[in-house]
Amino acid sequence: MLPVLYTGLAGLLLLPLLLTCCCPYLLQDVRYFLRLANMARRVRSYRQRRPVRTILRAFLEQARKTPHKPFLLFRDETLTYAQVDRRSNQVARALHDQLGLRQGDCVALFMGNEPAYVWIWLGLLKLGCPMACLNYNIRAKSLLHCFQCCGAKVLLASPDLQEAVEEVLPTLKKDAVSVFYVSRTSNTNGVDTILDKVDGVSAEPTPESWRSEVTFTTPAVYIYTSGTTGLPKAATINHHRLWYGTGLAMSSGITAQDVIYTTMPLYHSAALMIGLHGCIVVGATLALRSKFSASQFWDDCRKYNVTVIQYIGELLRYLCNTPQKPNDRDHKVKKALGNGLRGDVWREFIKRFGDIHVYEFYASTEGNIGFVNYPRKIGAVGRANYLQRKVARYELIKYDVEKDEPVRDANGYCIKVPKGEVGLLVCKITQLTPFIGYAGGKTQTEKKKLRDVFKKGDIYFNSGDLLMIDRENFVYFHDRVGDTFRWKGENVATTEVADIVGLVDFVEEVNVYGVPVPGHEGRIGMASLKIKENYEFNGKKLFQHIAEYLPSYARPRFLRIQDTIEITGTFKHRKVTLMEEGFNPTVIKDTLYFMDDAEKTFVPMTENIYNAIIDKTLKL
């Protein structure tokens, strides 16, 4: 009997060692899945409550429990939960009483990072009004498109964006849209002010009846994402999805004692849904900055006692490129949440700035699948959790990059790729993993659906991303497919850029694509041009046109002049070869140009310019 007992005890003692050797990530996998399952259980219970428990409800509870706790830190200003609560009450009352807004009326917000963005958003939640988050870099046609597809009745804009507002004001007035600056004075005829109205109303709590019709399926916010259709698409985010946006903050163990620092724009889902909402759910503090500054980043972290930072890959690279200082590790930052971080930058970042736990993730604003690299393996964007896969039925399928479509077998069904091979990420659309789609028509939504994937009648969400899962079940990002690439943390739709470039009088045809640049994340814009007969290329004119109509991250920095633009049998531009050839003047025989910001023109591409870009002495 004793030998059996000793054998059993020895087995128990050896079990952790055996698990570590055979299944080194099992405990982390189980822990992560249990956190997700617990969150899903709580969100299901929130749905069943009457009224439903929304992010707003979580904020109100925090304001009641810890009214004097700092909620927002901005420059030298500190706002408590109670102060933001009362200010958002005033916003809701002003919009309700003086503008006549009611639940369901959409309001577009066109401004940068500042506390007003947060208390306006909370005020809209108290009214039951969805908010359209307009990218403050967009202009003219794109701005009007974003505004119109969400059906907004009111535009609230920063006075800093006066020129952009005035450009589209005649069209907005024609559409009976009310336009207000988030200020107390206006220098634009036809544009009113909102802060004076907010100042003049009560800060007492708003009636729940103002938002009584809000359910989990009610649209809460529209966040814009560029896609293959050219113009930005308004992803519909309902109140149910807002909760799942906080998943990364909760799964990474953020608590009420944390101070989260974000320099990313609040019109992005990362800053709004992960940063702000994650902060609210746990009762933490959010430190805001209007725009990212590499030179001020760590000073801000020390000033605000930051413990958690948000990033995109480019951001951490910028920090690594700053001159080293003796106090590089003199900070309290323990965690970093974000995506797009290259392995070499990751290593350099933690080597220089300390053992900061980096939580890299993969997700999209509108998608129904996401991954988190909770074991923090450098270079991976996430982990394919076996238990998670039982709920979210995703696959990687073979994809023909040249034809820009999935590969199908003789029966017409998609083909799963084995581990270690790159494939298109798709996830089945179910009640547990829904795809809500986009506002402004069904066409864009339908384009993101793949039908008859593995059997007749099934429907999957097409992520548009090529990923790879290795033999250890770690997920790696490979590339984007179709007509979208990513630069400076922003999605760039090639068709939108091509439409703008094609308006120049000497351009007959244009093919826009992204090319990789050594030492940089994503791909930078490049355009192949065919010049009209009897016209000449004019670099200064093209520069002025592009600078006027495109934000800096979307501007093609390289041009390639061609006699013929190649197309496929289905009349799509061929991009693969062009992308592979890049912008090296010693390889490409066609005439190349470089966008020179200092000279405000396109100049001939030379070996010296090319070498300066490769050596990083010329910044892009």
Curated annotation (Swiss-Prot):
GO molecular function, a single term: cholate-CoA ligase activity
Single Gene Ontology BP annotation: very long-chain fatty acid metabolic process
Location relative to the cell: Endoplasmic reticulum membrane; Peroxisome membrane; Cell membrane; Microsome
Gene responsible for this protein: Slc27a2
Known EC number: 6.2.1.15, 6.2.1.3, 6.2.1.24, 6.2.1.7
NCBIfam families associated with the record: PRK08279.1
Topology feature Cytoplasmic, residues: 28-106, 289-620
Record keywords: Acetylation, ATP-binding, Cell membrane, Endoplasmic reticulum, Fatty acid metabolism, Ligase, Lipid metabolism, Lipid transport, Membrane, Microsome, Nucleotide-binding, Peroxisome, Phosphoprotein, Transmembrane, Transmembrane helix, Transport
Transmembrane helix listed as a keyword: yes
Top enzyme class: ligase
Family statement drawn from the similarity comment of this UniProt entry: Belongs to the ATP-dependent AMP-binding enzyme family.
Function: Mediates the import of long-chain fatty acids (LCFA) into the cell by facilitating their transport across cell membranes, playing an important role in hepatic fatty acid uptake. Also functions as an acyl-CoA ligase catalyzing the ATP-dependent formation of fatty acyl-CoA using LCFA and very-long-chain fatty acids (VLCFA) as substrates, which prevents fatty acid efflux from cells and might drive more fatty acid uptake. Plays a pivotal role in regulating available LCFA substrates from exogenous sources in tissues undergoing high levels of beta-oxidation or triglyceride synthesis.
Tissue expression as described in the entry: Strong expression in liver and kidney (at protein level). Lower expression in brain and testis, no expression in skeletal muscle and spleen. Shows uniform distribution in liver acinus.
Protein name: Long-chain fatty acid transport protein 2
Any Gene Ontology CC annotation: plasma membrane
Topology class, membrane: Multi-pass membrane protein; Peripheral membrane protein
Disruption phenotype: Conditional knockout in liver results in decreased long-chain fatty acids (LCFA) uptake by hepatocytes and decreased peroxisomal long chain and very long-chain acyl-CoA synthetase (VLACS) activity.
Annotated AMP binding sites: Y222, I223, Y224, T225, S226, G227, T228, T229, G230, L231, P232, K233
Catalytic activity from the UniProt record: a fatty acid(in) = a fatty acid(out); (9Z)-octadecenoate(out) = (9Z)-octadecenoate(in); a long-chain fatty acid + ATP + CoA = a long-chain fatty acyl-CoA + AMP + diphosphate; (5Z,8Z,11Z,14Z)-eicosatetraenoate + ATP + CoA = (5Z,8Z,11Z,14Z)-eicosatetraenoyl-CoA + AMP + diphosphate
N6-acetyllysine found at: K291
Lumenal side: 1-4, 128-267
Transmembrane segments: 5-27, 107-127, 268-288
Modified residues (Phosphothreonine): T577
